[in-house]
Design a protein with these regions (language model features):
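Glycine-rich phosphate/pyrophosphate-handling loop used in enzymes and phosphotransfer proteins
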Residues: 1-143
């Protein structure tokens, strides 16, 4: 608790896009992130849609990802999960309107090599998966 308070005093939370205080990514900057413009591939012989949540070249998103993966800031899983949720919500709406449903869904984070996890201190895809699981109330498999 004390460590968190001290870190907030030394490194206050501010939006990566506009520097607004008390947030890593404000709603205005979340909405202004560049959307992916390329063709979205399909996986598993067209049985599985892929979702690309943003343009990696977007400077705000790029900085968030780099600081999350290599800067050790685990709190960035929250704004990054919002980026994913924004795209997933579109897909869920389209699928429900067309009669497609998600069926039985389980979230499986991408495994991270043990050396990389030890170096980083956490598996970033696991943190994102937990955020999505909490938001959608979908089961998660961490095995």
């Amino acid at each position: 608790m004390f460590k968190k308070i001290l870190l907030n005093l030394l490194f206050p939370k501010k939006c990566y896009g506009c520097s607004a205080s008390d947030t890593w990514l404000c709603s205005k900057c979340l909405e202004s992130l560049q959307e992916y413009q390329g063709e979205i591939p399909r996986a598993m012989n067209n049985r599985c849609d892929l979702i690309i949540a943003g343009q990696y070249q977007d400077p705000v998103l790029n900085k968030l990802i780099i600081d999350f993966k290599f800067g050790g800031n685990q709190e960035l899983s929250k704004p990054l999960s919002k980026v994913i949720i924004k795209e997933l919500d579109k897909k869920i709406t389209i699928n429900s309107l067309t009669g497609n449903n998600w069926g039985e869904l389980i979230i499986i984070p991408v495994p991270l090599h043990i050396k990389r996890k030890k170096w980083r201190g956490f598996n970033q895809s696991e943190l994102l998966a937990k955020e999505l699981s909490n938001y959608y109330n979908w089961p998660i498999s961490l095995k």
